[in-house]
Amino acid sequence: MDASESQVVVSSSSRGRDADIVSWQALSEEAYKAFERKRYVQAEERFQDALKLAEGLTTAKHAAKAASPEDRQDFERLTKSLNNLAALYHLQGKYEMAEAMYDRCLDLKLDLYGDDHLEVAVNLHNLAALQCAKLRWEKAEILYTRALEIREKHLGNEHADLMPILKNYAIMLRKIKRDDEAQAMEERKSRIESLVAAAK
């Protein structure tokens, strides 16, 4: 068996925090590469191993009380691992598994950052896209709206990072036959796109 396929889940205390962080990074990178090559089984295995290491680093800690930079970084690794697995499950149509991971990731981010942070907006956007895939339009709209509000508050009304939400929100509105609202979203996205291009 390849060393990278051997059991990697050893307690943080026995291996040392630094070694676990190095292993987490290596596993995450292997998973990304497998994902890009559409080797989803391998990607899932690596992402799961990375998640277990990240969980080990946060054992007996609480995100809301993560005062030290090291503790916050450990929880940030955990949120990344959860989001990575959620995105993979989402792509594969494993929606219930994806939602569980996205929800857990969102809960951690709310504890870490509060409810008005750009990192929270990332998760809300991801959850909105998932709700669309599940045809839960009302839930998706609430999530898109909140994600957009947070980004507008922090970035202004003409920032490039608004475009992905506007695009996906418009696609949803088209699907539920709210074409006038969808067109307004599309036109706003186009205006921002033009402003961004002109600023380069």
Where are these regions (language model features)?
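Intrinsic-disorder-linked linear interaction elements in eukaryotic regulatory proteins
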Residues: 1-200
